[in-house]
Regions:
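Transmembrane beta-strands of outer-membrane beta-barrel proteins
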Residues: 1, 58-60, 112-118, 205-211, ...
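Transmembrane beta-barrel wall of Gram-negative outer-membrane proteins
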Residues: 1-73, 93-103, 110
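Transmembrane beta-strands of outer-membrane beta-barrel pores
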Residues: 2-4, 64-68, 109, 120-124, ...
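Flexible glycine-rich, low-complexity coil/linker segments exposed to the extracellular/periplasmic environment
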Residues: 3-5, 10-27, 143-174, 225, ...
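Signature of Gram-negative outer-membrane beta-barrel scaffolds
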Residues: 31-36, 67-69, 174-176, 192, ...
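Short loop/turn motifs that connect adjacent beta-strands in outer-membrane beta-barrel proteins
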Residues: 54-55, 110-113, 149-154, 197-207, ...
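Outer-membrane beta-barrel signature, preferentially recognizing the C-terminal barrel domain
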Residues: 87-104, 308-315, 373, 402-461, ...
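Gram-negative outer-membrane beta-barrel transporters
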Residues: 458-460, 477-610
């Protein structure tokens, strides 16, 4: 379970607030949210290992995992803008499963090894039931709302400011029922051949070549049903004539029959604030029965399908060659290169006159849109290990890696919301992010002192993906023709994803120390202490577009045109990468002992490393 307290603010105009040098924002709403979740996880595995002759073996792995989640989400919102109290509860059943099968073999012959494998993975995520009901209480505030909007957020709901004690004043406002199914199937096959060579102690190693094919098929199907239940309460009374009615207005459905009598009061946010709490909850079984009886009242909402559904596939073909060359006992050189080719094809929906929210029961024109893209990269890697002393080694590495776009951004959609003048546009033309990585690591080991490692790293990343919102303007990068849109949409807003033209860099220093206290007496003997400290500095050019207006030259009052022209103001600012820390510290304490000849370790550690160093042999 978890709980959140959220306050929303708003600010308009540029007139400074009295006594301040700026326009002070005001509260529009405060929200209490409590999420309860019950999880059941099941796992099963079946593995086989066959030896079919000298130097040959075949292995089979089968793994099934299932997860069911029963979710209960409660939210209470103090809506200052509209002067009402809103209580929303969502009851959901989410199920997921993964089935993985893999067959692989290794065969030794002629001082070489041939490895092969085939695999299949089937991942399914479905929400067969998600029911949401919203109750409202009108005019619960007992003081001037304007005065509440400037208070500290947790004081808005103080008993002297709002009267919510009579829950019979709640009335049923609306209901939503959602289902969703997402599937992802992956098929893969790979083949590797490794040939060792040995020219004595001065020069030995191996050469390895291989290839891989991977196919991914994805699909998401959603269904949303919604209805205003205050306006359509007579339909509910036809199905449930004895259901209780609201004391606020006898025409509306009340809350009394939905109350959970077994609800147990729990402190909200550990009683951090006196005025924040949930005093009741809806009964989940009653909510399910309500939908089962009144499912004919709910109406399908097409907007959700247009904005979320997709299908598609990706085909990845890769090949590589690498080698490990040991020059004496002091130098190990590991060069390699990988060729990566990806072809993708996705389908989604595009619509015109799409409603601006998912509560309007409107029909509109839409079509299925398909788009494809392909890209290929050569990804080199070089590793060098130098060991001048038995207890000292130096490691250098250069690698290039890819990070592919989120497939939800690749689904080709053109959503035109004419009522608010907005367009949402997605296509498969996004490039993967390419990272060039440099690492240098020095390690020193002494049995009496322990292991000391210091490393430096530098990363340069291009093709970061960001979302831009701008006006559609002719003769600019957001010319409607560039998106296949009609010129009549000039002046409308558009939101689309694109690759950033600015690179990001990350550089840092990492120090790691591990030592064992061998000379301490008793249980403390052999205690292992470790510490890791990372200092990082990152820099990214962020591209921001501000939608603005300028006065139209030669404007004539009454000529039927608008007095202002829309413009896009582009700004680039540099800052550290989002969610990228500048300092990390990890500590580890281990107490290895031996019980009956079995080594037992009880580590206690904190901190999570945010960086993965290049793998060095």
């Amino acid at each position: 379970s978890n709980a959140h307290f959220i306050a929303a603010y708003k600010v308009n105009g540029n007139t400074p607030t009295e006594g301040l040098g700026y326009t002070k924002p005001w509260i529009t709403s405060t929200r209490l949210q409590c999420n309860l979740e019950k999880r059941n996880r099941y796992n099963a595995g079946l593995n086989f290992d066959f030896k079919i002759g000298p130097g040959s073996k075949i292995k089979m792995y089968n793994l099934f995992s299932a997860l069911s989640r029963e979710r209960d989400i409660r939210e209470k919102r103090y809506d200052l803008e509209r002067g009402r109290l809103r209580y929303v509860q969502t009851d959901a059943d989410v199920r997921g499963s993964v089935l993985t099968n893999m067959l692989q073999g290794d065969h030794d012959f002629w001082n070489s090894t041939l490895s092969w494998g085939i695999g299949r993975s089937d991942s399914r995520q479905k929400t067969p039931y998600e029911h949401r009901l919203e109750y409202r209480m009108n005019a619960p505030f007992t003081v001037d709302i304007n005065a509440l909007s400037t208070l500290p957020p947790h004081l808005v709901s103080a008993p002297g400011n709002v009267n919510e004690s009579d829950i019979t004043q709640y009335y049923l406002y609306d209901g939503t029922f959602n289902t969703e199914r997402t599937t992802e199937k992956e098929y893969s096959a790979w083949l590797d051949w490794k040939k060792s060579f040995d020219f004595g102690k001065l020069f030995n190693g191996y050469i390895k070549i291989g290839g891989k094919y991977r196919q991914k098929d994805r699909e998401r199907l959603t269904n949303r049903n919604y209805r205003r239940l205050d306006q359509n309460a007579p339909l509910i009374y036809d199905n449930m004539p004895n259901i209780s009615r609201s004391k606020y207005d006898n025409r509306y459905v009340g809350i009394a029959d939905f109350m959970d009598g077994s609800f147990k009061h729990h402190t909200f946010l550990n009683n951090r604030y006196d005025n924040l709490d949930f005093s009741f909850a809806l009964n989940q079984d009653v909510m399910k029965n309500f939908y089962n009886v009144n499912s004919n009242v709910y109406r399908p909402i097409l907007t959700t399908k247009i904005q979320k559904d997709y299908d598609g596939y990706e085909r990845l073909t890769a090949a590589y060659i690498m080698g490990e060359f040991n020059i004496g006992k002091y130098i190990t050189f590991i060069p390699g290169v990988r060729y990566d080719h990806t072809y993708m094809r996705y389908g989604a929906y595009s619509g015109v006159n799409v409603p601006d929210d998912e509560t309007q029961e409107l029909s509109f024109d839409y079509t299925k849109t398909t788009d494809n893209n392909s890209f290929h990269y050569w990804l080199p890697q070089i590793h060098l290990k130098i060991k001048p002393l038995d207890n000292l080694d130096i490691r250098l590495a250069y690698t290039e890696t890819l990070s592919r776009p989120d497939y939800d951004l690749l689904a080709p959609r053109t959503i035109i919301k004419s009522t608010i003048g907005e367009v949402v546009y997605n296509r498969t033309n996004l490039k993967p992010a390419l990272s060039k990585n440099f690492d240098a690591i020095v390690s020193f080991y002494n049995p009496k002192i322990g292991l000391f490692t210091v490393g430096g790293f530098y990363k340069k990343i291009k093709n970061f993906i960001y979302t831009r919102s701008a006006y559609l303007l002719e003769g600019t990068a957001t010319d409607p023709a560039n998106f296949g849109l009609p010129s009549s949409l000039v002046g409308s807003g558009i939101t689309y994803a694109l690759n950033s033209p600015y690179d990001a860099t990350i550089k840092g220093l990492e120090i790691d120390i591990q030592t064992q206290l061998r000379r301490l007496p008793g249980l403390l003997k052999g205690v292992v202490i470790g510490a890791n400290i990372t200092l990082m500095d990152s820099k990214m050019g962020y591209f921001e577009t501000t939608k603005s207006r300028v006065k139209k030259p030669n404007y004539v009052v009454g000529d039927g045109s608008k007095p202002f022209l829309p413009i896009n103001k582009d700004t680039v600012y540099y800052d550290r990468l989002l969610k990228q820390p500048s300092f990390l510290a990890n500590f580890m304490l281990g107490n290895p002992t031996r019980i009956g000849g079995v080594a037992v370790s009880s580590p206690a550690c904190c901190g999570i490393s945010m960086r993965q160093k290049a793998a060095l042999s």
